[in-house]
Amino acid sequence: MRLDLYPAIDLKDGQVVRLRQGRMDEATVYGVDPVRIAARWAEAGARWIHVVDLDGALRGRPQNAAAVRAIVEALRQRHPGVRVQLGGGLRTLEALEAALALGVSRAIIGTSALEGDVAARAVARFGPDRVAVSIDARGGFVAARGWVEVTRVRAVDLAVRMREVGVRTVVYTDIATDGMLTGPNFAELEMMGRTGLDVIASGGISSLEDIRRLTEIPGVAGAIIGRALYTGAVDLAEALSLCGETRDT
């Protein structure tokens, strides 16, 4: 199965950082120029860039719009085939609309998927290709509001609910493995893959072997890769080749 790879750019105070298990107090800064880093991944052949507004995720509203706009505009000029998906603090239709107005191709709904009918309304308004739902889990249960609160909702159950209201794509993050370079939670991903959704896996990728195993899980359509790229544990061009991805530059 083809797997789309999403190099990650996590923004905190305008800088590119990586966290460990979502803890803001364990942020490692990998750069102060997100545009340059996005260009680096695009030049390696990426089709997508995954951008997260960490400040927005914590505060409940977007905080790094200027940096996101700069990334989108630079890619449009130099690498027009590369698309951006954005998450973090997008909990209302208004926030989603503002994110899409920045030029991103897909906006990711966070905590709001648990509350009311935001996901259903977003799909109806923007279409299933323009929105996705982020399902972040600890021990199989959904974590909300910047991963601060762990609910009693099972991740798989939320995924099924999202499918029933028209959502097509979910980003599944296993918090325990996020930023740890210990390998993804393959067992949870196999369960998520059986929901009928296109699942984008996030958390724990540490090697090309991890990526190869993800290509074998039905329903897993993509993978977000962060710390492994920034530490050099994985070469993006090699990973893209393994996944059968090529892009004309």
From Swiss-Prot:
Q: Which reaction does it catalyse?
A: 1-(5-phospho-beta-D-ribosyl)-5-[(5-phospho-beta-D-ribosylamino)methylideneamino]imidazole-4-carboxamide = 5-[(5-phospho-1-deoxy-D-ribulos-1-ylimino)methylamino]-1-(5-phospho-beta-D-ribosyl)imidazole-4-carboxamide
- Which compartments does it reside in? Cytoplasm
What Gene Ontology biological process does one annotation of this record name? L-histidine biosynthetic process
Which InterPro entries does UniProt cross-reference here?
A: Aldolase_TIM (IPR013785), His_biosynth (IPR006062), HisA_bact_arch (IPR006063), Isoase_HisA-like (IPR044524), Isoase_HisA-like_bact (IPR023016), RibuloseP-bd_barrel (IPR011060)
Q: Which UniProt keyword terms apply here?
A: Amino-acid biosynthesis, Cytoplasm, Histidine biosynthesis, Isomerase
Family in the record: Belongs to the HisA/HisF family.
Which NCBIfam families has this protein been placed in? 1-(5-phosphoribosyl)-5-[(5-phosphoribosylamino)methylideneamino]imidazole-4-carboxamide isomerase (TIGR00007)
Protein name, entry field: 1-(5-phosphoribosyl)-5-[(5-phosphoribosylamino)methylideneamino] imidazole-4-carboxamide isomerase
Q: What is the lineage of its organism?
A: Bacteria, Bacillati, Bacillota, Clostridia, Eubacteriales
